[in-house]
Amino acid sequence: MAKKIDNKALSCSFCCKNQNEVKKLIAGFSGFICDECIELCIHLIEEERKSNLAISNYSKLPPKKIYEAINAHVVGQQQAAKILAVAVYIQCIRFEHRELADLVAKSNVLLIGPTGCGKTLIAQTLAKIINVPFAMADATSLTEAGYVGEDVENIILRLLQAADFNVERAQKGIIYIDEIDKIARKSENPSITRDVSGEGVQQALLKIMEGTIALVPPQGGRKHPQQEFIQIDTTNMLFICGGAFTGIEKIIEARTSQSTIGFEATVKSKHDQDYNQILNNLEADDLTKFGLIPEFLGRLPVIATLSDLNQQSLVDILTKPKNALVKQYQKLFELDGAELIFEEEALVAIAQKALAKKTGARGLRAILECVLLDTMFELSNLKNMQVIITADIVKNNLKPIIKPKLQKKSAKKKVTA
């Protein structure tokens, strides 16, 4: 510990606190450091070590492990999970072997599927699996620079914020752009008028998706024009774009039906092929006709189509994932000493309601909230009680059955979640 020199109180060379304000002051050859600054340095070094460890560890995950981890959270999208697992593995190889970065191009992904099928969840799950920063943006809010709306650089700012402004970590993050189909140009032919929220946004996204040194305003670009910009290399960022692309099945059907014209052509009813079968025939030209410019599609080499969820898939989503909705509510009831039981028929009824509303998996929570709202309001008074949800309760908006907990022998069958 440092001592007073010439009866003058010594101070830390870093925080300038004198020795009376700190517990210990350590002397060096030409200065002093206090115990608080030492603790701060240790914390910063540990955080940096964890960050570097996380970045290096994820590269060792093989595609099969990534695939299994996705399927633990996302139900009914095995093919899309396999495609994404390979794409992320290629990205990991590029991180581990930087000399291959110029030789092996990154695999930006385009996810196509109806609302509520799990596009956003897959992207979020991927970021958690490989432990990298994740940011999400809505394409409908983006405009070209200089117009009212959000600049594309703000997407990178969100990723930087998710990485706690650690530029090195942010440069290896994942950006998910939702509703990408909403920035399709209005017609297949180039327009002579300015399309600042459609084709203009696609043009603005080209550079950052391909890889460039982006100048990111840390406080947002338009309200603080005098601020200093942060330089971020987007070369190693993985971009995942998702959209429902409503109506693209008609474009695919029109193309495929033209190739089977003639006396020997098989006449098919519109009901012969479902949505999932039609999407399996998707080609890049179909997306161009929908309104995505060829240059933009060129930055999205990997295209994965997600299946429309059927009744059984929705029932599985309710019970099978690690964070399944039924498990979440059962845990909440358990914390208050109550037991929540869903009969099998009740789960089917919930899935049928979601299908009728065409909200996919996204609508399941809203239905459960509606069924359990009054019961949750009185949950603190339901200790040692059993709450049973039947199909009739779900279909007719009735109150759940509440009764004292029964012995295992006489208890109704509980859904294994």
From Swiss-Prot:
Bridged cysteine pairs (disulfide): none
Nucleotide-binding recorded as keyword: yes
Record-annotated ClpX-type ZB domain positions: 1-53
Gene Ontology CC: one annotated term: HslUV protease complex
Record's signal peptide: none
Domain of life of the native organism: Bacteria
NCBIfam families according to UniProt: clpX, PRK05342.1
Protein name: ATP-dependent Clp protease ATP-binding subunit ClpX
Organism: Orientia tsutsugamushi (strain Ikeda)
